[in-house]
């Protein structure tokens, strides 16, 4: 095992790193001299097992486990043992990483055992190809692949997914079609004269060679290679400016060609271990095209080795899933994690109500609806979450895909959030996480700009490779999805070189800044589509509205009337919308969800923490280090965005209160908060001058441009609000003391909750839950409820009132709702006379799971 290709490659990386430190090395199967040595061994070495046992650790078990330990007898000998070739890679690269980031060699060698065990089976990174202008240079660059894949292996990702065909949401209005329908850009298929007339044979062959180079490079490093084929349309609609087209294919030969093409591709690239398919209508194939997909699956099965089939969950129905399972190949379902965005590190308790109910067949409404008959009809709840796929008896794997709609450009890195995602990736026995990397969708839909992938106008800030800017984020996500409880040295060692004595401040600043936009995303979700909602460079949605509508905005999947105050949270079970919160205030019926004012308070706190940390970095000696300068700029922008959204949320609450009560003081507060928000956005725009004026993630104005472009709409909304302040009707209220209502509701009960979650439940039997309520406000508690639901996003939450005496409350969840088909999620709502809170909540760092999951007890079933 120690001589396997991945282990040998890793040993070469260690030798190279030692060589850069000026240390000469040699390799031998045995060595009896007294020089310092690293012994690399698999679990079958009895001598190594005996030595490890004497250090107090066992031989690693599992393909990806490893141990590093000093030899108990020979002080200059370090043992690296892996449970499999991949574990050996991680152990050896851990040594290399410690040496790279150390100032001296000796302290980099661990003097006490280091043990690694994976928490998730799949830790994947998805990189999109969606621009011939911006993506062909890295795709054709062997040096890029060598550096990038080495980084992924070092950070303990175990899968790389090259994603093709996601450049458009639908095959209409196509300009940049390079690798969109990928097969003819990569190979010829015997028996078919399918070709791209604008593509030379040499370039086609080069594309295939690079695909093989990348996939073989993954195998050499112990990485799985996943190929995403997201589009199977071959004729672009209304696309006169398409730079590449497909010839030689007809509807009757479409499915057979795709079958034979995917089989040929897998034969030509034997290191491809899995294929991802987008099944829903945006693939260019109408939903319910069962014969088409069963034919394509046969091509995967025909390649002669067990290649996995990964099915994107949106629009996936039982028959298509069954056809994939019938191949006998490993099948994975990959739902969206937080729609097409990034939220806090937990799975949304509930999806938006808009996507939950089953609808009538929409096929007759339009051509687009015909393509989307399942995801817009019988199974809309599969669009933006785990849907109904978390069945306890599932014969497939689940890997959650974290999309990049929230933050695409600015640097990101928060250890607590990354660790939270590492835990959430295993929800209810799920297999892991696929992370869409930063810069996802850059240059999409024909908007690529030569040499413009990183977006810097200040060229001194450009990294060597585009991913270099985000290396710290890769480190966090990779290592903390491998082990969410990893020690902090795993990431802190990488900061010392650039930040020196201010490394701790830099870590704290970016951690706080990195929680801002995910919180905005879940609390105020103007659109589930990344093609419309981009909070990083937000297209303003107005607070002020009139009888004849509002100012224009792109958020067509938000509730009507479409204004800022009516927008739904992405998790409406945990967060209150602005308008809903105002109704709760006026009705005196708070329900304990996180209010927009609480969100604003958190955003302000995170912004303040970001600024405090980055100011400590700034007061250090002036530096030309590009990483430090990039962090300073981006953290400052993120802090300003936090203050903008805090002000906007506060303004919206007070404006909705004014509209409901007529109170002038509420309107004045709304104006003041929106003015503060405008100033914060202006600050972000000024600090973002290091970026080019047109940052392109799509052709529409909402997907390109710069922060400064968004200011006029923000100022127009502020002016509309000031105009309202001048209206005579605004001077009179209805007598409601609005400020007192807000103050009472925001004084959440201060209680101590004690609860021991059950180890499981018996399907069909009542599940008794108990909770203790103590603390400062325990005497004011008017009641406790439990909110629960089987973990199927198509279902609504149920409420059960708890009975209590002397601070102890109990309730029985009815067995009729606990069938055992799904795990069950629940949380508690504690109420006083005019306020409420939820338990367990998101916690002080906003990174905890706000509900408890209980699964059926194995081997037990009620009558």
Language-model region placement:
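Feature activates predominantly on carbohydrate-active enzymes
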Residues: 5, 10-13, 17, 60-253, ...
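Conserved, mostly hydrophobic/aromatic
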Residues: 18, 84, 152, 277, ...
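Catalytic-core regions of glycoside hydrolase
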Residues: 26, 102-103, 158, 170-181, ...
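Short, well-ordered secondary-structure micro-motifs within conserved domains or adaptor modules
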Residues: 26-57
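Aromatic-lined, polymer-binding surfaces characteristic
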Residues: 230-255, 268-273, 280-290, 629-646, ...
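C-terminal non-catalytic alpha-helical accessory regions
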Residues: 437-706, 710
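C-terminal non-catalytic interaction modules
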Residues: 693, 697-744
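Glycan-association/targeting regions that enable binding to alpha-glucans and other polysaccharides
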Residues: 722-863
């Amino acid at each position: 095992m120690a001589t396997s290709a991945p282990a040998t490659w890793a040993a070469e990386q260690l030798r190279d790193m030692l060589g850069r430190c000026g240390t000469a090395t040699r390799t031998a199967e045995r060595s009896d001299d007294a020089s310092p040595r690293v012994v690399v061994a698999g679990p079958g070495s009895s001598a190594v097992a005996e030595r490890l046992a004497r250090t107090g650790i066992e031989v690693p078990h599992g393909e990806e486990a490893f141990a590093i330990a000093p030899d108990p007898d020979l002080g200059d000998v370090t043992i690296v043992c892996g449970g499999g070739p991949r574990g050996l890679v991680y152990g050896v690269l851990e040594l290399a990483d410690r040496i790279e980031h150390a100032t001296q060699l000796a302290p980099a060698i661990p003097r006490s055992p280091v043990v690694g065990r994976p928490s998730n089976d799949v830790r994947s990174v998805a990189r999109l190809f969606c621009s011939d202008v911006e993506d062909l240079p890295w795709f054709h660059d062997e040096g890029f692949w060598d550096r990038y894949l080495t980084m992924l292996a070092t950070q303990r990702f175990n899968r790389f997914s090259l994603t093709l065909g996601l450049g458009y949401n639908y095959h209409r209005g196509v300009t940049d079609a390079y690798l969109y329908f990928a097969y003819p850009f990569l190979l010829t298929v015997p028996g078919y004269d399918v070709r791209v007339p604008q593509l030379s044979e040499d370039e086609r062959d080069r594309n295939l060679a690079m695909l093989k180079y990348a996939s073989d490079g993954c195998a050499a490093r112990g990485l799985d290679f996943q190929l995403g084929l997201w589009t199977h349309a071959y004729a672009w609609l209304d696309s006169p400016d398409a730079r590449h087209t497909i010839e030689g294919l007809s509807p009757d030969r479409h499915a057979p060609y795709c079958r034979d093409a995917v089989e040929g591709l897998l034969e030509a690239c034997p290191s491809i271990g899995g294929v991802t398919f987008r099944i829903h209508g945006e693939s260019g194939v109408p939903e319910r095209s069962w014969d088409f997909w069963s034919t394509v699956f046969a091509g995967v099965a025909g390649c002669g080795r067990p290649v996995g089939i990964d099915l994107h969950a949106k629009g996936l129905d039982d028959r298509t899933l069954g056809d994939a399972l019938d191949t006998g190949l490993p099948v994975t379902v990959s739902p969206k994690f937080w729609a097409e965005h990034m939220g806090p590190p937990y799975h949304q308790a509930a999806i938006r109500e808009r996507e939950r109910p089953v609808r009538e067949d929409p096929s007759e409404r339009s051509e687009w609806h015909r393509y989307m008959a399942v995801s817009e009809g019988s199974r809309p709840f599969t669009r933006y979450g785990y849907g109904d796929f978390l069945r306890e008896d599932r014969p497939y794997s689940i890997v959650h895909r974290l999309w990049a709609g929230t933050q695409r450009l600015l640097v990101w890195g928060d250890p607590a959030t990354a660790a939270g995602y590492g835990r959430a990736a295993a929800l209810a026995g799920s297999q892991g996480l696929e992370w869409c990397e930063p810069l996802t969708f850059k240059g999409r839909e024909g908007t690529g700009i030569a040499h413009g992938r990183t977006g810097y106008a200040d060229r001194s800030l450009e990294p060597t490779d585009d991913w270099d800017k985000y290396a710290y984020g890769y480190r966090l996500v990779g290592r903390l999805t491998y082990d969410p409880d990893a020690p902090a040295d795993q990431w802190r060692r990488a900061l010392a070189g650039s930040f020196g004595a201010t490394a701790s401040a830099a870590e704290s600043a970016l951690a706080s800044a990195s929680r801002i936009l995910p919180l905005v995303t879940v609390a105020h979700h103007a659109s589930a589509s990344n093609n419309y909602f981009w909070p990083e460079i937000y297209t303003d949605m107005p607070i002020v509205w009139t009888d004849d509508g509002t100012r224009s905005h792109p958020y067509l999947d938000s509730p009507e009337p479409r204004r800022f105050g009516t927008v739904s949270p992405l998790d409406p079970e945990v967060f209150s919308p602005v308008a809903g919160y105002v109704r709760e205030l006026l009705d005196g019926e708070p329900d304990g969800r996180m209010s927009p004012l609480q969100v604003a308070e958190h955003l302000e706190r995170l912004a303040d923490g970001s600024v405090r940390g980055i100011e400590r970095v700034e007061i250090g000696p002036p530096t030309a280090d590009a990483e430090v300068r990039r962090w300073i700029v981006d953290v400052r922008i993120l802090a300003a965005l936090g203050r903008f959204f805090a002000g906007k949320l506060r303004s919206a609450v007070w404006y909705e209160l004014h509209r409901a009560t007529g109170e002038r003081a509420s309107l004045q507060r709304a104006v003041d908060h929106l003015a503060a928000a405008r100033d914060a956005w202006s600050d972000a725009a000024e600090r973002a001058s290091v970026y080019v004026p047109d940052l392109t993630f799509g052709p529409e104005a909402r997907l390109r441009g710069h922060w400064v472009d968004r200011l006029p709409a923000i100022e127009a909304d502020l002016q509309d609000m000031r105009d309202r302040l001048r209206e005579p009707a605004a001077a009179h209220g209805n007598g409601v003391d609005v400020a007192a209502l807000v103050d009472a509701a925001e004084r959440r009960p201060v209680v101590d909750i004690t609860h021991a979650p059950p180890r499981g439940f018996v399907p069909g039997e009542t599940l008794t839950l108990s909770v203790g309520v103590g603390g400062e406000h325990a005497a004011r508690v008017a009641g406790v409820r439990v909110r629960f639901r089987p973990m199927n996003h198509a279902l609504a939450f149920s409420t059960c009132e708890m009975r209590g005496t002397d601070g102890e409350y109990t309730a029985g969840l009815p067995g009729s709702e606990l069938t055992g088909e799904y795990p069950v999620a629940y949380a508690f709502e504690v109420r006083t006379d005019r306020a409420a809170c939820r338990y367990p909540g998101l916690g002080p760092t906003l990174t905890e799971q706000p509900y408890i999951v209980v699964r059926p007890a194995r081997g037990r079933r009620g009558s």
